[in-house]
Amino acid sequence: MAQRNGMSPRPPPLGRGRGAGGPSGVGSSPPSSCVPMGATSTAGTGASAAPTATPGHGVHRVEPRGPPGAPPSSGNNSNFWHGPERLLLSQIPVERQALTELEYQAMGAVWRAAFLANSTGRAMRKWSQRDAGTLLPLGRPYGFYARVTPRSQMNGVGATDLRQLSPRDAWIVLVATVVHEVDPAADPTVGDKAGHPEGLCAQDGLYLALGAGFRVFVYDLANNTLILAARDADEWFRHGAGEVVRLYRCNRLGVGTPRATLLPQPALRQTLLRAEEATALGRELRRRWAGTTVALQTPGRRLQPMVLLGAWQELAQYEPFASAPHPASLLTAVRRHLNQRLCCGWLALGAVLPARWLGCAAGPATGTTSPPAASGTETEAAGGDAPCAMAGAVGSAVTIPPQPYGGAGGSAICVPNADAHAVVGADATAAAAAAAAAPTVMVGPTAMAGPAASGTVPRAMLVVVLDELGAVFGYCPLDGHVYPLAAELSHFLRAGVLGALALGRESAPAAEAARRLLPELDREQWERPRWDALHLHPRAALWAREPHGQLAFLLRPGRGEAEVLTLATKHPVICANVEDYLQDARRRADAQALGLDLATVVMEAGGQMIHKKTKKPKGKEDESVMKGKHSRYTRPTEPPLTPQASLGRALRRDDEDWKPSRVPGEDSWYDLDETFWVLGSNRKNDVYQRRWKKTVLRCGLEIDRPMPTVPKGCRPQTFTHEGIQLMGGATQEPLDTGLYAPSHVTSAFVPSVYMPPTVPYPDPAARLCRDMRRVTFSNVATHYHYNA
């Protein structure tokens, strides 16, 4: 560029120069095209040479799409739609929670300009105005993008201050509109624009916001809810927005954006998606589909079976209800708790089991095989509309064709390819042959048992409940709480139980949170940075405290992942928990690059170091171990998680041994509402008013609830036939012997006085005074409100 008036040439503005998202050669940061050639991907894709862009400022040649796994090429991020980065990021399977190293660097290269502009709120607003119209990928789920949009062009946002929903953030700026691809099979009105940026759907009312430290939020305008998608850039590049449940709601999503729960039987799909009311749906499920097993797809985790329930009492066949002292009384107490929480009629859809029960051979719990003709459900549907079997085991050789879903319910025939994506328009003959090779019908929990789980009882990780307003909730027997899962059944078939895996990440006004029964905020995630985000550590190197240095640190090639992936091919233990070992390798590599002592960082965060016993070093090959250069023999344990994060991890990993840390405290709120709501007899506004009144009366206290899974060292809870808890259950205190002496008087002068034990009163009015520890102002107000 020639000089003007003797002045030096002006550098290109941020995000407009050569390279994806910023000027090339700034600091030690590699350009967007400098993706390591030897990067290893768990998807099994190889790396190829990166194409080069045409030199020149603002002029870029459209590169042809490369094969899956090709490294991203250089080019402006506005050219992302025609670049190989889009093809690379569209190969992420639904089951995978984290991105590979190659996909991680592609995300960082595309989001480079936004990261470098993330210094102040004013700089972010200028960036959104300068790069308006640019498409940026959200990583997970694939097919979703952020279209950079100035706030003045966002319809309906107005002067909304997002800091009211997150007061601890210094600033939060809305920068983009969330859009997604539309499948022509699900929405025929799209036509030829299905593969064009103009054919993207922007009707969800979702906006992307960025905060200080590159905290990423998704703002739901319709519900006035702020959702925390990522706490820093490292988490955003690694996981994307895949944990945001709201993204999966739009009914214009097609078969491949993203893949949903597989329902091979069209009759069952029509029953679930086209039921006008919960009463008719419950009647149809009990009559025809009771005991049918569905392979439930949740983004970011493996398939897991969900057994459709015909009656509430069927839960007595699953743990933890089967091992309770009185399963019928416990189920009555849980049903009473659901009535109190939902404040309306509801329907139990099914029990979600761990993934190890998926695809087991049909037969009772002892491992024997029963003939399929013994099922009454199959006999009823012998006319050609039999209920579907399980959709297939993970890794099974049987190919099960996924079916279209959503509001439109198209008729495209799809088969899964090697990357677990749906290919629209496949051969109908092959799909019919795959459907004919499906497993036999499995009914009930006994049909789930096989040789791998012989002699055991399935454990219900979640009980899926549908209220009469159409919303889907999940009752968790692990901690006894009710969590919102989806806004409707079609949303549930796309998002699965993701709402219970990412708890405490939605911030909404009190009335909105009470209406949707949102859980409490996880303050650890909202107010504190991640302990392993070492690039934000205050004792990190000086070069890592400015944006260019941080980006170069995050996108540097080789963070210890190649060694772990090599060992995973030889050791089954590492292969089973490869994500944990990859995370440990990244932490060790990051600490070494930043000059931090990982053991000190872990202990400051509340964790500890586990020292493995190894042989004494002998010889030159072990000199590095003696000098402490390698820390493979000392693996740090993570600091203790919050109760919500711990529960989410247990549900994601099917940890059947997880137990809550404590029981509800003595000051917990005891709901005295005994109303039984008839299904289909309540109005929407009345239900919302009941939930809001109970939230006001509770005053933020913990809810006293049945605990099917009691903490360690506690006795199981006991209930009456009406579901009323008897005193003395699920407590960590020793048993009361009946001997009582005042503590301020010496026992030598005052003899022990025998006091009779507490007698439970079946009368609701007398039960109010059975234990003064539970009588608070909110309890009394609730009692008079519902019993006046």
Curated annotation (Swiss-Prot):
Q: Where is the composition biased (Gly residues)?
A: 16-25
Pfam family, any one: US22
A GO MF label: RNA binding
The Low complexity compositionally biased stretches are 26-56
Q: Which residue intervals make up region (RNA-binding)?
A: 74-248
Q: Which GO terms describe its cellular component?
A: host cell cytoplasm; host cell nucleus; viral tegument
The source's superkingdom equals Viruses
* Cellular compartments annotated: Virion; Host cytoplasm; Host nucleus
Region Interaction with host EIF2AK2/PKR: start and end of each range?
672-788
What segments bear the compositional bias annotation Basic and acidic residues?
651-660
Arranged from A to Z, the UniProt key words for this protein are:
Host cytoplasm, Host nucleus, Host-virus interaction, Inhibition of host autophagy by virus, Inhibition of host innate immune response by virus, Inhibition of host interferon signaling pathway by virus, Inhibition of host PKR by virus, Interferon antiviral system evasion, RNA-binding, Viral immunoevasion, Virion
Renumbered to this chain, region (Disordered) spans 1-82, 610-663
Main subcellular localisation: virion
InterPro entries, per database record: US22-like
On assembly, the entry states: Interacts with host EIF2AK2/PKR; this interaction retains EIF2AK2 to the host nucleus and prevents its activation. Interaction (via N-terminus) with host BECN1; this interaction inhibits host autophagy. Interacts with the viral DNA polymerase accessory subunit UL44. Interacts with host HSPA5.
Q: Which family is this protein grouped under?
A: Belongs to the herpesviridae US22 family.
State the protein's purpose: Inhibits the establishment of the antiviral state in the infected cell. Prevents the phosphorylation of the host eukaryotic translation initiation factor eIF-2alpha/EIF2S1 and thus the shutoff of viral and cellular protein synthesis by directly interacting with EIF2AK2/PKR. Prevents stress granule formation in response to eIF-2alpha/EIF2S1 phosphorylation, thereby rescuing viral replication and protein synthesis. Also inhibits host autophagy by interacting with host Beclin-1/BECN1.
Domain comment as written in the entry: The N-terminus binds RNA. The C-terminus is required to bind and antagonize host EIF2AK2/PKR.
Q: What is this protein called?
A: Protein TRS1
Q: What is the lineage of its organism?
A: Viruses, Duplodnaviria, Heunggongvirae, Peploviricota, Herviviricetes
